[in-house]
Amino acid sequence: LSVNHDYFETDGHPLAVVGTTYMSSEVQRLFFEHPNVFMWNQDLGQIHDAGLNMIRTGWWTGWDKFCDENGQPYERTLRTLEAYLMTARKYGLPVQFNFFAFLPDVLGGNNAFLDPAAVRRQQTLISAVVSRFHDVPFLAWDLINEPSFSQHLWTMRPNGDPIELAAWNEWLDKRYPDRVKLAAMWNVPPQSLAGTISLPSEMEFSPRGMYVGVNSLRVNDYILFAQESFAQWARTMRATIRVTGSQQLVTVGQDEGGIQDRLSPAFWGSSVDFTTNHSWWQNDYILWDSLAAKQPGEAMLIQETGLQRELNLNEIARRTPENEAALLERKVATSFIQGSGAIEWLWNTNSDMTESNETPIGAVRTDYTEKPEATLLREFARFAPSLQEHLRDPQLPPIAIVTSQASQYSVLADFQLEAQRRAVRALTYLARLPAYLVAENQIQRLGNPRLVILPSPQALSDTAWAAVVKYVDTGGTLLITGPVERDEHWQIRHRAVELGLKAHAEPLVYHNAELKLGERRISLAFGQQQQSWLDSLHFDDGSTLREMPHGKGRIYWAVYPVELAEELQSAAELYSYVATRIDIAPPFSLLAPLPAGVLVFPTVMSDSVLYVMSSDSDEDAAINIRDQATGAALAFRLPAQHAAIAVIGKKERRVVAKYGF
């Protein structure tokens, strides 16, 4: 089991991952306390017969049963894992094994990631387990499932212990050796930073803290401190694995919080061998889930996906089993857009869970009857072998969306996240232009897109701004929507003026505005929250979109944060206008109109073009398109809220593999 820059491989051949999570149908997460190889053999045989090609497993609870207080695993623990791996090997199933869940605090210490004593015991556990199985070729290690940085799970808040406080101050001293300058950045009196600098308080994470004398300008630094500290922990654990002689894959299993305000693959991705995302709740942003988790030059896997049960107020399920399966179909299909595939959570439903949204998750019920999800997974598994032979050398789309972490790691994060999501939908669903995402701290790995879009940034670090301007200088085209006149500490910058534009930022305090695109006028409307917090740009000549040469490239600058206007079509029209100006056309032509809720996303491979189509519409859609690269036509009916995949061979100029039609 290995990875290249984009996909998994087995024995050197691409693998389209269609897997599941499995512990035991009998005792679920207690399978190490109560191992039953007879049940494993039965269940893994069923998974194998379904055609699935990878399983994820590991420890989510009960670590005190697996090892002593120093982290040394018991011999029975290692023998249990050996039996599990032998059973998986019998059925040819690669295994991802998870060590910790949420916070690795089970081995004591004052801070799970920063306390040397705690980290040493974690290394003992990992080292002992990996040493025993370091040469198992079908095994990968997941360091921790859905990590949070502190005891305040699923948020980015300080733990508040002395070790964290000391590490925070050490980090600040290295990053900002001049306390007077740091005070200016944070807009506080210099004397307030004398001595030990406290961790941010809860009020500082509130956008209204400034009204009670507490500003939030330290939040960005705290989040960067947490990101870098966790990335260092991941590097330490990966190095611990490598010392054993293991060359097995290592990852971190993060959920959607990682691409929002928690520990992000944009930071820890370089510490592991592939990145992940767990697509659970962001059902309206399934594509964004994948694009944001994918890091430049590194494979990405949707490592958990499934259906959390949605309930009405009377505790009755909102979705039918068939509708749940349709949503899972869209998630699995979309996982092949710049991703390696998906692992479903969970094969057997876990009736021991205490929350009603989790109890029913799984393809096989406790009475061993199957949900429609199981049939769906079998269908994807049958398709995977015909897909994976084409998963080679994917080309990046010509458009990159650069995300602002300066805004995303502020107390106004929701605006930047919404700008990203709406930019993705406007480009791909409405303008029919595929794109990829690059986070601000990854800007040096941008590549060579023909167009970079900076959607409603409001703020950006000086380093990132210099990088995008350099991209333009070397011949690229940049589209900015709204101002970018602040840095990560919300300090004023005069970036438009520095580019030779007579312009300034001002508060966006109106509901209606117009954006002029040549002879066309696009109406924009901004809601209450946008009027309360956002800025717009004002050009002295009254124009609303400027086009200007810079170096060898060009900059298009719209004065409004268009992605955050109420009507999404406005952003799509702006994107199409700029793309047309620089001769970027959709990679397929529409032979018949498509509903706005239908995604058609092509990826050019070395020998083919991979088309993923997903419907968010309430009506069936007649897909009738022609691929521009091959001239091949694609025509079929896509059922409402379902997905389909087609592979068009470049030599054959026709569909050579398909799913869903």
Regions found by a protein language model. Name each.
Residues 333-413, 421-434, 499, 503-528, ...:
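Aromatic- and carboxylate-lined catalytic core of secreted/periplasmic carbohydrate-active enzymes
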Residues 255-264, 425-445:
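A short, well-structured beta->alpha microelement
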Residues 135-266, 271, 289:
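Polysaccharide-binding and catalytic clefts of secreted carbohydrate-active enzymes
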Residues 324, 456-661:
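A conserved amphipathic helix/loop scaffold
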Residues 1-54, 68-71, 378, 389-390:
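N-terminal carbohydrate-binding accessory modules
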Residues 36-107, 116-121, 126-128, 234-244, ...:
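Aromatic-lined substrate-binding rim segments of carbohydrate-active enzymes
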Residues 105-109, 205-221, 291-327, 348-367, ...:
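Active-site clefts of carbohydrate-active enzymes
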Residues 124-125, 234-249, 266-352, 369, ...:
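Catalytic-core region of carbohydrate-active enzymes that cleave or remodel glycosidic bonds
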